[in-house]
């Protein structure tokens, strides 16, 4: 992130499309890591854990070989309000050298968790818009794409994707293979 932008202690990324949400998490983590070595800064908490204790433990661990830590916990939507309580308690007084990236995925996010993140951080809505906003969303993604499409090709691609616009990144990656 640029020095002008604040780095929050916590981010919650949520969205209905798994691919779009994953892309948003990847972009956010890259922004948070900046020029640092991701292997020294980023810790992915195993999604198989049945509790959020591993995420809380990782978030409470100070950085060792870097100035900051970025802890990513995916699938936090599968936990109940009671199960999320330790994470909510951590967010009341987060470690200043850690940024916690929580990824919704699966289930309803506990309201207390969403509110705790809002108090100290930022909620990222990673959904795909509808109508005209969807066209603008696609145009933005195509502008940053590794291939250039004219307006007619972009319209055909949009029609082909329909409601599954989360596949856009994969299709653009495949197009590079065939060039």
Language-model features: locations:
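Conserved beta/loop motifs at nucleotide-recognition and modification sites
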Residues: 1-177
């Amino acid at each position: 992130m640029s020095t002008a932008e604040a780095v929050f202690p916590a981010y919650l990324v949520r969205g209905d499309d798994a691919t779009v949400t994953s892309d948003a998490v990847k972009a956010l983590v890259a922004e948070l890591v900046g020029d640092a070595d991701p292997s020294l800064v980023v810790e992915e908490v195993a999604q198989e854990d049945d509790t959020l204790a591993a995420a809380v433990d990782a978030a409470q661990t100070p950085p060792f070989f870097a100035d900051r830590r970025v802890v990513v916990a995916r699938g936090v939507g599968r936990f109940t309000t009671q199960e999320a309580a330790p994470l909510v308690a951590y967010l009341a007084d987060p470690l200043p050298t850690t940024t916690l990236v929580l990824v919704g995925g699966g289930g309803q996010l506990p309201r207390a968790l969403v509110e705790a993140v809002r108090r100290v951080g930022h909620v990222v809505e990673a959904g795909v818009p509808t109508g005209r906003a969807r066209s603008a969303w696609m145009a933005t993604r195509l502008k940053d794409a590794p291939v250039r499409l004219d307006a007619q090709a972009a319209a055909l691609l949009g029609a082909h994707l329909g409601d599954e616009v989360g596949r856009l990144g994969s299709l653009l990656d495949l197009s590079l293979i065939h060039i």
